[in-house]
């Protein structure tokens, strides 16, 4: 997951690995506390989960990100879809 997120953020070095790993954990925790089952979140092949985490990280990574609100909305939409898909 770390490499997937780093690629989506256009990060090639390891300088930000700790921050990115923390964001990945925070995204998973937010999804879990929003009712998404941990077993669902651990499925590394689930594209909805991967893209939700990616959008969370894009919204939260760095400073002065003019697109952070756009990525936050995308994350919230995917979180809602995950809740529906999981329970459907």
Residue positions per predicted region:
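Divalent metal-cofactor coordination and adjacent catalytic microenvironments
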Residues: 1-88
